[in-house]
Amino acid sequence: MQATSTRYEFKQRFRVPARQAYEWCTDYRTDDLSLMGEKGYRGIQRLTEDTLILTESVRTGTRTVRKRKLVKLNPKELRWYNVQLEGPFKHSTFLYHIQPEGTNASRLRFTGLIVIYSKKKLPSRRVSRIAHMERKFDAHAWVSLAKAMEREIATRK
């Protein structure tokens, strides 16, 4: 089995203060997948105050994709990351950082460091295409999450 790694990044703006955005993003609930437009199940095991294991089964067309992720939280710096322990991008790491933009807005800086496994060495064009598709998928999910966050936080006021 060959392994190749690559990275991708994007930013997502929130019309929510940074601390509130961080707290909303890291409160991990069983219905989070539906907020991203996905159908599936999320199990949450809190190991410590700053460490969780997420177990997800997501239906994509005719198949179910299972993932198990280790999540580490860093609330002081408004950062967190997850490492995929099981799933299609096993051993991949995803970094999240909420940055303030004034007092009433913030921005997520997302970095995906993915590991791609294949039987043969993948051509660089194929690796770039996979990274492009993953970036597109993740960025779209965060657009949906941003809308849900802004709607939910606005109703709390």
Residue ranges of predicted features:
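Hydrophobic/aromatic beta-strand elements that line small-molecule binding cavities or substrate pockets
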Residues: 10-12, 42, 65-72, 92-100, ...
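Residue-level preference for beta-strand/loop junctions
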Residues: 4-6, 62, 90
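Short amphipathic alpha-helical segments
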Residues: 17-20, 24, 133, 137-141, ...
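Intrinsic-disorder/low-complexity, polar/charged segments enriched in Ser/Thr/Lys/Arg/Asp/Glu/Gln
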Residues: 5-13, 51, 77, 93, ...
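Beta-strand/loop substructures that line and gate deep hydrophobic ligand-binding cavities in soluble
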Residues: 83-140
